From Swiss-Prot:
Subunit details: Part of the 50S ribosomal subunit.
Gene Ontology CC: ribonucleoprotein complex; ribosome
Keyword annotations of the record: Ribonucleoprotein, Ribosomal protein, RNA-binding, rRNA-binding
Pfam family name, one: Ribosomal_L6
Function noted in UniProt: This protein binds to the 23S rRNA, and is important in its secondary structure. It is located near the subunit interface in the base of the L7/L12 stalk, and near the tRNA binding site of the peptidyltransferase center.
SUPFAM superfamilies: Ribosomal protein L6 (SSF56053)
Source taxon at top rank: Bacteria
Signal sequence segment: none
Gene Ontology biological process terms from the UniProt entry: cytoplasmic translation
HAMAP family to which the protein is assigned, alphabetical: Ribosomal_uL6_B
GO molecular function terms listed in the Swiss-Prot or TrEMBL record: rRNA binding; structural constituent of ribosome
Family per similarity comment: Belongs to the universal ribosomal protein uL6 family.
Entry protein name: Large ribosomal subunit protein uL6
């Protein structure tokens, strides 16, 4: 039994939810999100509460039940509060700059790495070594942050690289010289 799928989601104040056929639209003070869910799942809106009900007890339906409920919850939080990820760049000469609708990262390669900024995200650089990614779509914020981190993952030996602000890097000792 999917406990996640059985959650009752409360619609925040100043948030409008429209459900028609297998499509849900959530509008809030920060923007609007859309999601098309499976026909095996039924989404109900009553008295400012959203419930999801599955049509049968098959394994894939149970999986879709929990996933649909979690995505709708993320949509409700996204349009009312938004999501934010902070990234730190550590290393000598490592930095990032915004150039138009691209971010250019210098991370120890022979060339700078550029990534196109998604239109639905806001990217800020308070310092050249700090990046703040914010938006209403949790999946888009997380994916762009992961793509940035993938440019130069943090090294367990030196601690240099691109990492999330709250990320703890498990450090390793280097080799010791033999006598």
């Amino acid at each position: 039994m999917s406990r996640i799928g059985n959650r009752i989601l409360k619609v925040p104040a100043n948030t409008e939810v429209v459900i028609e056929n297998n499509h849900i639209t959530v509008k809030g003070k920060l923007g609007e999100l859309h999601y098309s869910f499976s026909s095996l799942i039924k989404v109900n809106l009553e008295n400012g509460e959203i419930t999801t009900v599955r049509s049968n007890e098959e394994k894939t339906t149970k999986q879709l039940h929990g996933t649909t409920n979690a995505i709708i919850k993320n949509m409700l939080i996204g349009v009312s509060e938004g999501y934010k990820k902070e990234i730190e760049i550590k290393g000598v000469g490592y930095k990032a700059t915004l150039k138009g609708n691209e971010i250019e990262v210098i991370a120890g390669y022979s060339h700078p790495v550029t990534l196109a900024l998604p239109s639905n995200l806001k990217v800020e650089l308070p310092k050249p070594t700090n990046i703040i990614i914010s938006g209403i779509d949790k999946q888009a914020v997380g994916e762009f942050a992961a793509n940035l981190r993938k440019i130069r993952k943090p090294s367990p030996y030196s601690g240099k690289g691109i990492m999330y602000k709250d990320e703890q890097i498990r450090r390793k000792e280097g080799k010791t010289a033999s006598k």
